[in-house]
């Protein structure tokens, strides 16, 4: 069993459990370093989805320097080495409720459409940025997509 979490100042790390999740031992290395255009402030809140026959997809939140938070994604064949995708999958600005930040997501699988690709609903925290410092009112929002 592998657990992914954020370690402040380092990015997303992982730990393994050999006892069904009662205890974990941190693995060496960083899975997602906060070193890209969209996550240079921090990378946090990982959510992992297994892709049939293709490894894993991680969704995670990233802060850029301007107090903006986007939802980002990376893929991996083994769960250890991750390749970041070049653009966010969800960015602020979709509506007045998420004008400044999109973060802390949770992915839910929806019933498949007949002969269609899997469908997912992403529930996430959204901030309107109406207060000083890109702060403001936080709400729960959602979006749907096929993976």
Predicted ranges, named:
Residues 1-147:
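Carbohydrate-active catalytic/glycan-binding domains of CAZyme proteins
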